């Protein structure tokens, strides 16, 4: 764990707060790769992952930007309302679930709204390497585009394309993805935006191995489709009943079984747990289709069981 201090807070766009974090003792911070995130331990015991958006070569600071979500479960609201300059925060070391491919002839970076944060770090790395890339930044309005002035003044401004709903340059994912070649696509943003972009890429013949994405929020699950099941913990010998209205993670916590949690939506993989027997009902946005098909792990923060019982490696 890292002990950091908030050195700066800045409103990057309406509803988007930028944070600059430094080591409390002034020492260099652990290095990170483009696409990485920190798990912030926030007031009230909340832990939430936020993407690093500064240049990965920087070791004197970490920069984040957090959108105040009207449907916040506490994380973004705590950041906006409770954090102050000079305050200390505990965080994880940087972790990367959305890495750049080491060698690619061309990269297409698609960001929707606050999805610009990991994409911003990627653009800085690609520019520093001299790689061929395009950054397409989609927002409802230019005034809502965090970092746009910085991007348009950057050394790679010619690679940046802003698509605002109220602007002159409409976003046409089909046209942009038509001639894929051997390019790699990186997309981050709201779920609907991401599914549209990925759907256009698949229709255009892109191979799944060249599609990279990171979700910031889980898809909404249909109401009333959850059912109760039994969870058996192989190592501790406990048998727990998981009611329809509660998650496995909540039931484990009630029983005093601690597992690591961060997003609590199935998007970060922090709580990934081995399944020894039974069939999970995967509701996460973290595992690949191939990983889901093996049914040997699941995310207890949101996923459930298709079988009457799951045996977990806990």
UniProtKB/Swiss-Prot annotation:
Positions that bind NAD(+): 105-217
Any one of the GO BP annotations: lignin catabolic process
Listed CDD domains: fer2, PDR_like
GO molecular function (one): 2 iron, 2 sulfur cluster binding
Top-level division of the source organism's lineage: Bacteria
Major enzyme class: oxidoreductase
Record InterPro entries: 2Fe-2S_ferredoxin-like_sf, 2Fe-2S_ferredoxin-type, 2Fe2S_fd_BS, Beta-grasp_dom_sf, FAD-bd_FR_type, FNR_nucleotide-bd, MRET, Riboflavin_synthase-like_b-brl
Pathway the protein takes part in: Xenobiotic degradation; vanillyl-alcohol degradation
Keyword annotations of the record: 2Fe-2S, Aromatic hydrocarbons catabolism, Electron transport, Flavoprotein, FMN, Iron, Iron-sulfur, Lignin degradation, Metal-binding, NAD, Oxidoreductase, Transport
2Fe-2S ferredoxin-type domain boundaries: 229-314
Residues annotated for [2Fe-2S] cluster binding in this entry: 263, 268, 271, 302
EC numbers for this chain: 1.14.13.-
Keyword Isomerase listed: no
Keyword Nucleotide-binding: no
Domain FAD-binding FR-type span(s) in chain numbering: 1-101
Named cofactor requirement(s): FMN
Protein family: Belongs to the PDR/VanB family.
This protein's name: Vanillate O-demethylase oxidoreductase
Organism: Pseudomonas sp. (strain ATCC 19151)
Gene that encodes the chain: vanB
């Amino acid at each position: 764990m890292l002990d950091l201090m908030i050195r700066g807070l800045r409103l990057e766009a309406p509803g988007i707060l930028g944070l600059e974090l430094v080591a409390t003792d002034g020492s260099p911070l652990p290095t990170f790769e483009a696409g990485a995130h920190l798990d912030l331990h926030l007031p009230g015991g909340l832990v939430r992952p936020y993407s690093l958006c500064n240049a990965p070569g920087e070791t004197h600071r970490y920069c984040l930007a957090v959108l105040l979500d009207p449907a916040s479960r506490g994380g973004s609201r705590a950041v906006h309302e409770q954090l102050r300059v000079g305050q200390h925060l505990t965080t994880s070391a940087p972790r990367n679930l959305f890495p750049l491919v080491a060698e690619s002839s061309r990269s297409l970076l698609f960001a929707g709204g606050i999805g610009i944060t990991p994409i911003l770090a990627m653009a800085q790395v690609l520019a520093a390497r001299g790689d061929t890339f395009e950054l397409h930044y989609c927002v409802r309005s230019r005034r809502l585009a965090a970092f746009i002035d910085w991007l348009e003044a950057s050394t790679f401004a010619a690679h940046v394309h802003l698509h605002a709903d109220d602007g002159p340059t409409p976003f046409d994912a089909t046209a942009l993805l038509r001639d894929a070649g051997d390019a790699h696509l990186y997309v981050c943003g709201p779920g609907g935006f991401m599914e549209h972009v990925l759907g256009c890429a698949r229709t255009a013949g892109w191979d799944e191995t060249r599609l990279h994405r990171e979700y910031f929020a889980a898809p909404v699950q249909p109401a009333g489709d959850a059912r109760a099941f039994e969870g058996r913990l192989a190592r501790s010998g406990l048998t727990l009943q998981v009611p329809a209205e509660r998650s496995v993670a909540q039931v484990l916590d009630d029983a005093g079984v601690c597992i690591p949690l961060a997003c609590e939506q199935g998007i970060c993989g922090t709580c990934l747990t081995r399944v020894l027997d039974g069939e999970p009902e995967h509701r996460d946005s973290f595992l690949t289709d191939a990983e889901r098909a093996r049914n040997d792990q699941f995310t207890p923060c949101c996923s459930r069981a298709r079988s009457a019982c799951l045996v977990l490696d806990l």
